[in-house]
Amino acid sequence: VKVRTRSSAILGTICLVGSLALGPASADEPAAPKKAAVALTEVATAQNPIAGAAGPDDTVWIAERAGTVRVLTGQGLGQPVLDISAETTTDGERGLLGVAFDNDFAHFYISYTNLEGTSTIDEFAVQDGAIQPDTRRTVLTQTQPYENHNGGDIKFGPDGYLYIALGDGGAGGDPHGNGQKLDTLLGKILRIDPAGAEPYAIPSDNPFVDDPNAKDEIWSYGLRNPWRFSFDSGTGDLLIGDVGQSDWEEIDWSPASSEGGENYGWASMEGTHPFRGGTEPANHVPPVFEYDRNGLGCSVTGGYVYRGDAIPDLQGQYVYSDYCDGTLRTLKIENGTVTGQGDLAVNGGEVISFVQGGDGELYVLGLGGSISRIDAA
């Protein structure tokens, strides 16, 4: 079993040594990266925009929580190209929660909760930039015990596999212990190959394929509600914004060279802190960054490492926010260590998600309706 323990992570990649030895950066350890002067340019409004993905021909596809998908072009936001509003519910934290294209734009995927609250991943074929409705098929489902902590983000990694974020099942404090259990998909990042079989194949190098007591789909675990995650399009590193319980928000990091199996600690740990008397797991991979709820907000919204061309001073910085605060902030992460923190001095309102366009430029989605692009000031 290829479980990345703290010691194996050190042996497996030098770049993680700094973060494990020094511990994660936190909001009370300020350091300033290169200051980027930016502005938010509202390019469209939508009804509760909640997620998005870069589409073919320089488009950006926007998901609205109630179940519609619309395409953003230079001419604005078009009419819905997909509508599953009769098949989902927005009770609790449910709804249409994530969208993604595969790496050649041949298939489009949606992540949503159905009317029973079950987390569902569906696939559509795409032809000439258009969804083919009659090709729809369900790839994966996961029952949810409660209405919150659904996760729901989906992304294709640089390896061509589909990564799926699922929360711990909800309520509070992970009452079923799902975060640390390997016999459930809840509280995990999954890694599957939807093109490899029906309904999907398991990549042969997934970390738990040889463990009869673990789900083969699991890539990493110990997560509470990994609402938004992304891959650095420059390096392939994985960054996860995991929403905390009541005290600590965290951003987790793993290098592109990771073999998976990271245990991010929940619910034994909240960030680097024992949760309700918990004991730190021996294989705990601490967050690269954490902040408490007395300062920057109360619900982290993970973002992207900026790789666009419009704002040179922002190049290589991880842009993130917080739903309760809305300020756009940055981290400079080098070899798994935060070497700088910044404040972009702009506010996106109830920032629910970021979208990276095909050109590397970033869009900010405010649940109240705004779709804004981060531009040079």
Task: Label every PLM stretch briefly.
Residues 2-28:
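Secretory targeting and sorting signals
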Residues 28-173, 228-244, 248, 296-336, ...:
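Acidic, Gly/Ser/Thr-rich repeat motifs that build Ca2+-stabilized beta-propeller blades
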Residues 79-91, 135-150, 194-219, 265-295:
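Surface-exposed loop and turn segments in beta-propeller and other repeat-based domains
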Residues 186-192, 205-234:
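Loop-centered beta-sheet repeat module
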Residues 192-194, 373-377:
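Short beta-strand-to-coil "C-cap" segments at the C-terminal boundary of structured domains/repeats
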Residues 337-358:
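Conserved blade-ending motifs and adjacent loop-strand segments that build the rim/top face
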